Amino acid sequence: MQILFNDQAMQCAAGQTVHELLEQLDQRQAGAALAINQQIVPREQWAQHIVQDGDQILLFQVIAGG
């Protein structure tokens, strides 16, 4: 399957979860947030959320301000 991960085109296996994709890419970061197709996916759902062909995935660091 073809996806965009942080604006980079890449291939991933069919049926792969977000958690598995992040493990494969060594992208396990505390304080990170993830959006798929411009919708935030809560960390609790990463292990169940299946990546779909054409998904646009953004992983970014959450920064607190004040």
Swiss-Prot record:
There is a cross-link at G66 (Glycyl cysteine dithioester (Gly-Cys) (interchain with C-184 in ThiF)). C-terminal thiocarboxylation occurs in 2 steps, it is first acyl-adenylated (-COAMP) by ThiF, then thiocarboxylated (-COSH) by ThiI. Pathway: Cofactor biosynthesis; thiamine diphosphate biosynthesis. It comes from the Bacteria. GO terms for cellular component: adenylyltransferase complex; sulfurtransferase complex. Coiled coil: none annotated. One of its GO terms (biological process) is thiamine biosynthetic process. Is the sulfur donor in the synthesis of the thiazole phosphate moiety of thiamine phosphate. PANTHER family: SULFUR CARRIER PROTEIN THIS. Belongs to the sulfur carrier protein ThiS family. NCBIfam families: thiS (TIGR01683). This is Sulfur carrier protein ThiS. The lineage of its organism: Bacteria, Pseudomonadati, Pseudomonadota, Gammaproteobacteria, Enterobacterales. The gene is thiS.
